[in-house]
């Protein structure tokens, strides 16, 4: 088991998933962000070095480079080895019945952007690569209501919203679209 040599990652987490933000800023200048899929099939762990904790969204807004400097304003690049606990600790991994699967990713370069969404809640976006330069793109959005929820105009159509793999999509007259109107049929 090691860093995945292939298989680009495109993953979205939402408030439907298990999200935990742990504040260690007072003792270690550290914030740990953990996201585990609702069905417990995969998990991501990010270590943010920060001297402050944002009481509204947890992690202060900004762009955090992924590296090994341990400096404030960065995210720890994963070496994959937790020597203290004698364990393998990837940044993103798959699980099945509590056991690791072969597909693991160790983020070694890139960045994590933290911002507030339109509802003022946490929006996190990872653009990284692992040691094999496999592209990794992960988004977490804490959700919140938007003006779109109550809009109803024009003729009635066979249209509904659906959540697929953590991504909000629109099914209209049998065709699947993303939120900007792109046809998702590939």
Model-found features: residue ranges?
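Boundary/junction segments of secreted and surface-exposed precursor proteins
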Residues: 1-17, 162
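Edge beta-strand at a domain terminus
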Residues: 1-5, 110, 125-146
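Surface-exposed helix/loop patches within compact recognition domains
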Residues: 10-115
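A short, structured loop/turn motif at beta-sheet edges
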Residues: 114-122
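Residue-level detector of functionally pivotal "anchor" positions at catalytic/ligand-binding pockets or at interdomain
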Residues: 143-172, 183-184
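Short, glycine-anchored, charge-dense loop/turn motifs used at functional sites
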Residues: 176-182
């Amino acid at each position: 088991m090691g860093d995945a040599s292939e298989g680009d990652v495109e993953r979205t987490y939402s408030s439907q998933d298990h999200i935990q933000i742990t504040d260690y800023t007072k003792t270690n200048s550290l914030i740990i962000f953990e996201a585990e899929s609702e069905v417990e099939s995969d998990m991501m762990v990010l270590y943010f070095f920060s001297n402050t904790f944002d009481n509204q969204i947890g992690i202060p807004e900004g762009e955090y480079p992924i590296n090994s400097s341990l400096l404030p304003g960065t995210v720890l690049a994963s070496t994959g080895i937790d020597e203290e606990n004698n364990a393998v600790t990837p940044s993103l991994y798959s699980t099945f019945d509590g056991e690791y699967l072969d597909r693991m990713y160790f983020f070694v370069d890139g960045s994590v952007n933290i911002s507030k969404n339109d509802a003022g809640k946490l929006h996190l976006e990872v653009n990284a690569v692992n040691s094999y330069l496999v592209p990794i793109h992960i988004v977490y959005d804490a959700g919140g209501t938007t003006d779109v929820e109550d809009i109803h105009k024009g003729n009635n159509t066979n249209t509904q919203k659906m959540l697929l793999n953590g991504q909000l999509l629109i099914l209209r007259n049998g065709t699947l679209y993303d939120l900007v109107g792109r046809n998702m049929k590939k």
